[in-house]
């Protein structure tokens, strides 16, 4: 028979191809990381970084070379290792056999003796000898063979044991609460505590009603169920079973409950075993991924574990690191039994056992927090859980110390700081404890200023919040300068210091070296428009209302455009101040339908001024805007006018006659003021009661006089008026040139024209009768009756005077001549004859008064001049 082959040992060995592949991946990863970092470094830093990497990689490469050369000798070495392992295994089997024999000897001391051999005793006592003992010890008859148990007997025995154990547990044993769930099978009872252990017990007692608690229990199997724990080695299992049986034997003698004792021993052993596993995992982490950032201290008396992490956060005193103020304390402690548990306690679920727990305390900033420990949580998960909580505390502290106007929020385990369109994301590395800064615009390769801020924070020279405040303001300044340059703006220095940034254009400089600038307050995130003199003093300032839009080149162009608008509005304000007119600057709602809705970033504004107006139909409130280098004035007319078309545009003025809205586009305030005066006169004309208003436009108003005389009042650019009578035979054509200056700006602007037309109509009616009428002015007229005879009509405030005149020597063609020719007219007696013969005072009801000696007829205001002249002229024709 050939001896068995020596087993080949593979545990703890790694194939060389896997080592080479792992090393290759590691080198490639470091090269990729190096390629990302090198472009942002200086030449000296690049050389230093490459040299460090070469020295470190050379050491690993030399080790790999040694392993490759050793491969040639590895078969012989492996064979020696297998032989040594085989011999050590045989030695362990021999030693284990000795220990097992000792244990059997110890355990058999508690076994019951077999029944007396009555057959042999009777044989010896009756015959004096025994046939079975007569043979030599080497004889086969020396060993008495026992009849083997049948399967039925075995099953009956196991069933009897199961019933015995079930009765004992149901009626007589005190079962701790963790042992509530158990299984009885194959003559044993198995108690399982999840994530801790399972233990199997049996008995050699035959009576479940043993007095007291003298029921004999024997541990026959044990297994650990701890997470991250391999199967229980045989030597540990045997040791634990032996220890448990010894404790059971001692408790059997002292009459103590067995099951609570077993649970206390095994539960406490599992807790200490888990604490030991956490210590081993911590030691492994401190040598690998957490190297330099973790230190574990394990104390055996009493067993406890302290984890010190992030040593760079130690408080420094006089340049020396102080005591660590944050660490994790893991230990086993007993918890008191609550009153609720005592109330629910029973024999089947007893609380009379040691309530040992594995507790985790987190010490930080003088505060102790209890952290729940999951059954499946290892050392790395526990560290990550604690460091993430610590990171949140650090980020929250930084958030509180940030500038009040810096908007930040917790997102995804980090702190997000908003800088216009971009975002600075601040996170804490869970392993190193250092702050990591990244940008949303370039998350893989953060800008140089972010890396510089990381370095300053790592040096721990200043509080992180102070560095982040400066970084925030630096990012704002950098982004503003970049966008301003694209928007053709340049930064202005020397006028304002931090926190203001000012921008301007060359064309914004006014006379006297005053300058318009856009000022941005980086602390309050607010814009303003300012006018500065040469000494840097602020002459005028106006806040700019911005919305939540993004800052871009388009938005900056909008700001530039807004400043140009503000310059125009400032000129209007200056004009209003000079004229003593009240004004107020108002922001326009962002959803208002206006023409200069350029972007959604800047909320434009308008100027509200109060224009002087004596016309109640014209609203004095005027809103002023600016667009494309022009001033836009908006106002309204109250009431409904007899318009010719619904809307009308005349040069720089637009009006909607339906709503009365007026829009005037001009270059300066003086032009608007001139147009405004013209509109006041136009509205005053349209609201008159002296005439019937037929139609109104921006240039003229059409009237009707006495239902048959239609004429038009036209307004010129210099706010003067001309009258035009549509009827070419109208008698008023004679005096139209004298009617131009009869208008005023009041509500009764056209009333004098009605009075004049009413009083002159009686004189001018002579034209309709075929006589020549001469107008020297609106008060003096001559009616030519013949070549050498006429009537002079003088209008005054009291009435009218008719004087009879005759022409001496001048030719009729000179009747329209100068005053010299007119003076040649002399009074005559014809009018006296008319008065004495055909006109009587009674007939005209006292409306006229004759003065024969002066050849005059006087009439008061109420006299009907038209009727009187018709009467006189009719009489003259008869003669």
Swiss-Prot record:
Gene Ontology annotations for the cellular component aspect, listed alphabetically: core mediator complex; mediator complex; nucleus
Main location: nucleus
Top-level taxonomic group: Eukaryota
GO biological process, one term: regulation of transcription by RNA polymerase II
GO molecular function: transcription coactivator activity; transcription coregulator activity
Known role: Component of the Mediator complex, a coactivator involved in the regulated transcription of nearly all RNA polymerase II-dependent genes. Mediator functions as a bridge to convey information from gene-specific regulatory proteins to the basal RNA polymerase II transcription machinery. Mediator is recruited to promoters by direct interactions with regulatory proteins and serves as a scaffold for the assembly of a functional preinitiation complex with RNA polymerase II and the general transcription factors.
Subunit structure: Component of the Mediator complex.
Family membership noted in the UniProt record: Belongs to the Mediator complex subunit 14 family.
Name this protein carries in UniProt: Mediator of RNA polymerase II transcription subunit 14
Species the sequence originates in: Schizosaccharomyces pombe (strain 972 / ATCC 24843) (Fission yeast)
């Amino acid at each position: 028979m050939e001896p068995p082959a020596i087993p080949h040992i593979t545990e703890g060995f790694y194939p060389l191809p896997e080592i080479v592949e792992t090393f290759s991946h590691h080198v490639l990863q470091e090269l990729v990381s190096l390629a990302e970092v090198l472009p942002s470094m200086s030449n000296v830093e690049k050389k230093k970084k490459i040299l460090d990497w070469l020295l470190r990689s050379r050491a690993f490469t030399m080790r790999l070379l040694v392993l490759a050369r050793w491969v040639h000798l590895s078969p012989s070495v492996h064979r020696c290792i297998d032989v040594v392992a085989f011999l050590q295994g045989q030695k362990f089997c021999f030693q284990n056999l000795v220990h097992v024999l000792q244990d059997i000897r110890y355990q058999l001391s508690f076994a019951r003796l077999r029944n007396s051999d009555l057959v042999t005793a009777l044989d010896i006592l009756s015959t004096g000898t025994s046939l079975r003992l007569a043979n030599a010890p080497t004889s086969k008859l020396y060993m008495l063979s026992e009849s083997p148990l049948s399967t039925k007997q075995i099953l009956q025995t196991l069933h009897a044991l199961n019933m015995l154990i079930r009765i004992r547990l149901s009626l007589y044993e005190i079962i701790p609460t963790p042992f509530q769930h158990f299984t009885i099978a194959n003559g044993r009872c198995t108690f399982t505590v999840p994530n801790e252990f399972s233990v199997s017990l049996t008995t050699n007692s035959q009576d479940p009603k043993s007095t007291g608690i003298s029921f004999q229990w024997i541990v026959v199997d044990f297994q650990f169920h701890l997470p991250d724990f391999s199967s229980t080695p045989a030597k540990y299992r045997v040791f634990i079973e032996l220890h448990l049986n010894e404790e059971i034997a001692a408790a059997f003698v002292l009459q103590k409950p067995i099951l609570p004792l077993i649970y206390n021993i095994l539960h406490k052993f599992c807790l200490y075993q888990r604490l030991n596993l956490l210590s081993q995992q911590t030691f492994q982490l401190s040598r690998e991924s957490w190297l330099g950032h973790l230190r574990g201290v394990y104390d055996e008396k009493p067993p406890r574990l302290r984890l010190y992490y992030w040593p760079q956060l130690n408080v420094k005193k006089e340049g020396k690191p102080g005591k660590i103020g944050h660490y994790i304390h893991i230990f086993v402690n007993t918890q008191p039994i609550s009153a609720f548990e005592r109330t629910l306690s029973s024999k089947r679920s007893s609380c009379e056992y040691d309530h040992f727990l594995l507790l985790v305390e987190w010490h930080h900033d003088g505060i102790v927090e209890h952290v729940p420990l999951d059954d499946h949580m290892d050392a790395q998960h526990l560290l990550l859980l604690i460091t993430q909580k610590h990171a949140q505390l650090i980020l929250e502290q930084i958030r509180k110390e940030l500038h009040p106007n810096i908007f930040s929020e917790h997102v995804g385990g980090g702190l997000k700081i908003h800088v216009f369109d971009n975002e600075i994301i601040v996170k804490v590395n869970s392993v190193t404890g250092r702050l990591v800064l990244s940008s949303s615009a370039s998350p893989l390769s953060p800008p140089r200023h972010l890396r510089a801020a990381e370095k300053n924070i790592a040096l721990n020279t200043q509080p992180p919040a102070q560095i982040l405040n400066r970084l925030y303001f630096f990012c704002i300044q950098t982004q503003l300068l970049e966008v301003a340059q694209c928007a053709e703006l340049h930064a202005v220095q020397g006028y304002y210091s931090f926190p203001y940034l000012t921008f301007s254009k060359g064309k914004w400089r006014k006379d006297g070296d005053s300058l318009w600038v856009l000022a941005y307050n980086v602390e309050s995130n607010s814009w303003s428009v300012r006018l500065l003199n040469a000494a840097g003093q602020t002459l005028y300032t106006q806040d700019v209302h911005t919305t939540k839009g993004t800052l871009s080149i388009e938005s900056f162009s909008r700001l530039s455009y807004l400043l140009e608008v503000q310059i125009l509005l400032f000129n209007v304000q200056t004009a209003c101040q000079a004229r003593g007119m009240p004004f107020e600057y108002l922001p326009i709602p962002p959803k208002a339908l206006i023409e200069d809705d350029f972007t959604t970033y800047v909320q434009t504004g308008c100027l509200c001024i109060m224009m002087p107006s004596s016309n109640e139909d014209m609203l004095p409130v005027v809103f002023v805007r600016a667009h494309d280098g022009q001033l836009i004035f908006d106002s309204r007319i109250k009431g409904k006018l007899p318009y010719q078309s619904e809307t009308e545009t005349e040069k720089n003025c637009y009006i909607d006659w339906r709503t009365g809205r007026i829009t005037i586009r001009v270059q300066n305030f003086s032009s608007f003021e001139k147009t405004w005066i013209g509109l006041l006169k136009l509205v005053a004309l349209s609201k008159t009661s002296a005439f019937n208003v037929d139609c109104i436009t921006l240039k003229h108003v059409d009237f009707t006089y006495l239902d048959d005389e239609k004429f038009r009042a036209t307004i010129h650019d210099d706010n003067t008026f001309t009258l035009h009578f549509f009827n070419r035979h109208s008698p008023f054509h004679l005096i139209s040139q004298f009617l131009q200056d009869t208008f005023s700006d009041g509500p009764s602007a056209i009333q004098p024209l009605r009075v004049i037309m009413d009083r002159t109509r009686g004189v001018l009616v002579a034209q309709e009768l075929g006589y020549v009428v001469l107008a020297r002015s609106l008060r003096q007229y001559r009616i030519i009756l013949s070549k050498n005879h006429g009537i002079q009509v003088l209008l005054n405030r009291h009435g009218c005077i008719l004087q009879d005149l005759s022409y001496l020597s001048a030719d009729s063609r000179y009747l329209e001549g100068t005053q010299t020719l007119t003076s040649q007219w002399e009074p005559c007696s014809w009018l006296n004859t008319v008065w004495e013969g055909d006109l009587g005072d009674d007939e005209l009801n006292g409306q006229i008064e004759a003065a024969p000696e002066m050849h005059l007829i006087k009439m008061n205001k109420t006299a009907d001049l038209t009727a009187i002249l018709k009467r006189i002229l009719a009489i003259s024709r008869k003669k």
